[in-house]
């Protein structure tokens, strides 16, 4: 539950003011050059004050929104946690970019370096990955990046043969658990059963291993990943699990050592080492990785990227659908059954024909980005454009985009504060995919060794669409929220 709490949806901000295009940013000469507003404040005092605002007095959403209003700009300088007193090697200074146009610069690899900036200037100990620098921490200019990205993409390609079968098999178990809990208790909390389902599904599809070959891993592997993830991101995340000032004192004051999870992580490592031979040989023989590098990167893709991402995104999607009372369920059900006819007709091809289902998935990713913050470091001096001005960025400065605000850019998205299920339907709706950046790049982009876009960009949206379609082949209606399901009516 800690993982879910850390990624809880931010309050809805008011729309920012900007416009962008998936094409390279407009020539800076077309816009006025402006001195970048904002301040880092006095040494120690400024970063500490911003940290307390971010975590305590304001929260991330209000933190960025009030500064954008104060400076009358969607681009400005400020600080972001973690910082003083026990993060002496972390520079909290950032350039915030809060509109679609300025945010798009984060994906121009000629302008930015993505080395060691997954969660900002703070990097969790390499001990969490057995001392290996995994692919996410590499820039595209580093030779090993192409090998690791290629390994990830080929693993995903090969997994497509069993992806649908394993997904539906594990969903059968998941929904069986939910139905049983509802019949016994009148409602079912589904976060943990869903995480167990996700873990088992990913082990089988990505690593080619049935988690049940190890009863300990089948029972506890997903719990280990929850702890492993939490220890890495706690210093950067507002949790709300304990009252302030205890959260600041106990949770945001220091980095957590990998030793706290080393024993259980080693069990996961050994599980992959002993059972995922085909996948590991792919990494060793085709991409020239050592066996240790292949294991550590496979675990990162499985645990951090896939499991962590789905654990945040899918509850948002399920909660959005189960909590809707506008007639959306009836519309989705009608589309799914019209396209599929029967459950046996559900596949990648048929789900791609479900425009409304896909649009709901995309709109959930816009409304609740699973990764709220994205970072990149200026590779050189350059000019960054917002909707109404140009600013000078110096080499080495850290750019930070806060997606819950970026994805509510009123100059790009009509009525950005509203969840519109049909937003991406039709030709006009498809154009908006150019500005959907949840995957570290646009939804219309192509992941490759030359960029940092999520290798699973397309399979994530397909998987979510398959889950929704599967749901409405099973049930006529379903009632609940982002944490529990209260009732289901089976399909007639």
Curated annotation (Swiss-Prot):
It comes from the Eukaryota. Residues 1-34 form a transit peptide. Heme binds at residue 454. Residues 1-33 are annotated as: Disordered. GO terms for molecular function: heme binding; iron ion binding; lyase activity; monooxygenase activity; oxidoreductase activity, acting on paired donors, with incorporation or reduction of molecular oxygen. Expressed in roots, leaves, flowers and siliques. GO terms for cellular component: chloroplast. Its cofactor is heme. Keywords: Chloroplast, Heme, Iron, Lyase, Metal-binding, Plastid, Transit peptide. Induction: By wounding. Disruption phenotype: No visible phenotype under normal growth conditions, but plants lacking HPL1 cannot synthesize the green leaf volatiles (GLVs) hexanal and trans-2-hexenal. It is found in: Plastid, Chloroplast. InterPro entries: Cyt_P450 (IPR001128), Cyt_P450_E_grp-IV (IPR002403), Cyt_P450_sf (IPR036396). Its EC number is 4.2.99.-. One of its GO terms (biological process) is green leaf volatile biosynthetic process. Catalyzes the conversion of (9Z,11E,15Z)-(13S)-hydroperoxyoctadeca-9,11,15-trienoate to (9Z)-12-oxo-dodec-9-enoate and cis-3-hexenal. Possesses low activity toward (9Z,11E)-(13S)-13-hydroperoxyoctadeca-9,11-dienoate. Required for the synthesis of the green leaf volatiles (GLVs) hexanal and trans-2-hexenal. Belongs to the cytochrome P450 family. This is Linolenate hydroperoxide lyase, chloroplastic. It comes from Arabidopsis thaliana (Mouse-ear cress).
